[in-house]
Each structure stands twice: as C-alpha cells, then as structure tokens.
C-alpha cells in the first residue's frame, strides 16, 4: 500500500512539474529576447526541451537559430571591389602607390557549429515537409554562409521549386496557407538576394532561378523583369535586356519596372549615337 501511494505521489508530482511544449517555447522565446539567440541560458532551455520533446519542430528551429548564431562572427577584410555582398566598404584607404583599398565587414563561420544548425533544420523539414519557414531558414543560412558563391543555396532553392512543381504541396508558413502568388513572391525575395550580392556566381544563380520559375509560369512579369535585369546589369547587354522588358510591357503595359528600365536603355542608346 505504501509503495502504491509513493507511485501515485510521484506521478502527481511529475504531472505538476512537467512542462508542455508551448511552455518550453514561451520560456525559450523570452530568454532569446532577453539575451539574444546564442546568449546565456538558451542552450540549457533547448537541451531540456529536446529531452522532453525530441521531435518538436519549434525546438529544432530554435536549435538551428542557436547554433547558426553561435557559429557566426564578423571580420573586417580587404576586398578588391567597390561593393561586396551588396554592401559599401566600412573603410577606404590608399596604399603606398595611391591605389584605393577597401575594407568590408564579412561574416565568417565555425564550420562544425554551422553543420549542427543545418542538421537541426533538416530534421524539422523532414518532420514538417510542407512548412516553408524551415526550408527558407535553411536556404537563407546557406546563402549567408557561402557569401559571394551561393551554389548550395541556389541548389536548395531549385530543389524546392522542383518539389513544388512535382508535388503541388499545400504549403504553410507559420500556420497560414501559402497562395501561389505568395510562393512566387517568396522565391523572388531570394532571387533579389542573389542579385543584390552582385558577384558573377550570384548573378548566375539569379538567372537560373528566374528561368526555372518561368518554366512554371511563362507569363510571370516578375521573373521576366528579372531576366531583363540580368542582361542589363550583369551582362551589359541592353539589346537582350530590352527583349524581356518588351515582353513584360505586352503583358502589363503599365509595369513600372520594365518602363523605367526601358527608359534607361533608350537613354544609353541615344548617348552612343
């Protein structure tokens, strides 16, 4: 009888102290707001949360963010460019020959910690394949990690587009359904990120993703404008760029982007005469 009472009391005690997943998330979010994504006490909460709910996708995203932040630091590096990763230099000096030398703030990563972050978000994607937020978490992290050569990020985005085209999943983002327009707009955000980076490799990723999206929607003025921008800015080929802008204007005569860029092309053409 005493043993039975002890078991009952232990069960009652456990029920009173056990935390729900929502309570762990609330405590985690509060700690992050207080000390930052990789601050003191964050890992302790994540470990307790993971022990109680090892397949909680919110916990896995939390671990992803923790290890991503833990892996990242910044350095000031000399780069032979006027812009790097879409940013202006934080410092410009002259060398002994009078040549301008630019210094930029550049993200650097601890590879082993970064791999842990990727493993965590991969598990979240496996458990919730229709949750776009986890896929975008992964792609965004890869893009920052790779800096001016976003090959893995572009491949991950292409895989996402292919998966969307083949499976037509009912995408969700933070619990809300994602429309076709929302999906295309989200892809465009990453296209713009590659465009803004402004390196030869990132421009190619910008082109490849835009062309892939046009296979699914050949009349998308969004991605037709992208290809116009690619040829106009990355390749300096106004003639080829104009072909895409003219396609846009046939589909949407009032399109502001195509109209503005055609004016620039016409202005450049008149200067050459």
What do the PLM-derived regions correspond to, one by one?
Residues 173-233:
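Alpha-helical adaptor scaffolds
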Residues 21-24, 57-58, 132-133, 168, ...:
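Helix-start (N-cap) detector for alpha-helical repeat units in TPR-like alpha-solenoids
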Residues 54-55, 129-130, 165-166, 218-219, ...:
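Short coil turns that delineate tetratricopeptide repeat
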Residues 17-104:
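N-terminal leader/linker segments that initiate helical-solenoid repeat arrays
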Residues 66-123, 127, 144-185, 196, ...:
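Short coil/linker segments at helix-helix boundaries
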């Amino acid at each position: 009888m005493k043993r039975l009472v002890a078991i009952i009391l232990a069960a009652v005690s456990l029920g009173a102290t056990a935390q729900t997943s929502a309570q762990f998330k609330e405590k985690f979010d509060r700690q992050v707001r207080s000390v930052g994504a990789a601050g003191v006490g964050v890992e302790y909460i994540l470990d307790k949360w993971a022990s109680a709910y090892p397949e909680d996708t919110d916990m896995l995203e939390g671990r992803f963010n923790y290890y991503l932040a833990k892996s990242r630091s910044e350095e000031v590096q000399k780069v032979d460019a006027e812009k790097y990763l879409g940013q202006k230099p934080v410092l410009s000096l002259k060398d002994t020959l009078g040549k301008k030398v630019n210094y930029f703030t550049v993200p650097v990563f601890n590879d082993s910690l970064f791999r842990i972050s990727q493993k965590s978000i991969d598990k979240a994607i496996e458990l919730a394949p229709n949750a776009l937020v986890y896929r975008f978490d992964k792609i965004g992290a890869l893009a920052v990690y790779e800096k001016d050569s976003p090959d893995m990020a572009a491949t991950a985005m292409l895989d996402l587009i292919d998966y969307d085209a083949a499976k037509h999943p009912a995408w969700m983002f933070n619990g809300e359904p994602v429309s076709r327009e929302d999906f295309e707009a989200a892809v465009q955000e990453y296209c713009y990120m590659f465009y803004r980076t402004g390196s030869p490799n990132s421009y190619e990723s910008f082109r490849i993703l835009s062309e892939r999206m046009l296979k699914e929607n050949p009349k998308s003025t969004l991605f037709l404008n992208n290809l116009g921008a690619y040829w106009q800015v990355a390749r300096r080929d106004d003639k080829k760029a104009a072909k895409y802008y003219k396609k846009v204007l046939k589909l949407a005569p009032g399109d502001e982007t195509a109209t503005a860029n055609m004016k620039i092309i016409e202005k450049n053409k008149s200067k050459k005469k």
